[in-house]
Amino acid sequence: MSITTERKQQLIKEYAITENDTGSTAVQCAILTERINNLTEHFKSNHKDHTSRRGLLILVGRRRRLLNYIKKNNVSEYLDLISKLGIRKIK
């Protein structure tokens, strides 16, 4: 259900702005998106797992707040990020 350390390092390399960047909003959104996708796969076979569903909603809300922050500060970076992550625009 959680992502591996190798996958997390791969996401950090892909979305980092500088070499030692591990906490920028783009990196955080990428990691949250990976966790959300893993939980979505989990629910295909465990549809009664309501506790994890609550965790999923918390992760989606956290990602939405980060994306709103990026959208407010840099619209072009926001559009680039959502296209790379494969998610829809926030209304």
UniProtKB/Swiss-Prot annotation:
InterPro entries hit by this protein: Ribosomal_uS15, Ribosomal_uS15_bac-type, uS15_NS1_RNA-bd_sf
UniProt keyword list: Ribonucleoprotein, Ribosomal protein, RNA-binding, rRNA-binding
UniProt signal peptide: none
GO biological process, one term: translation
GO MF annotation: an example: rRNA binding
Gene Ontology CC terms: cytosolic small ribosomal subunit
Pfam families in UniProt: Ribosomal_S15
Alphabetized PANTHER family for the sequence: RIBOSOMAL PROTEIN S15, BACTERIAL AND ORGANELLAR, SMALL RIBOSOMAL SUBUNIT PROTEIN US15M
HAMAP family in the cross-refs: Ribosomal_uS15_B (MF_01343_B)
Subunit record text: Part of the 30S ribosomal subunit. Forms a bridge to the 50S subunit in the 70S ribosome, contacting the 23S rRNA.
Assigned protein family: Belongs to the universal ribosomal protein uS15 family.
Protein role: One of the primary rRNA binding proteins, it binds directly to 16S rRNA where it helps nucleate assembly of the platform of the 30S subunit by binding and bridging several RNA helices of the 16S rRNA.
This protein's name: Small ribosomal subunit protein uS15
Lineage, top ranks: Bacteria, Pseudomonadati, Pseudomonadota, Alphaproteobacteria, Rickettsiales
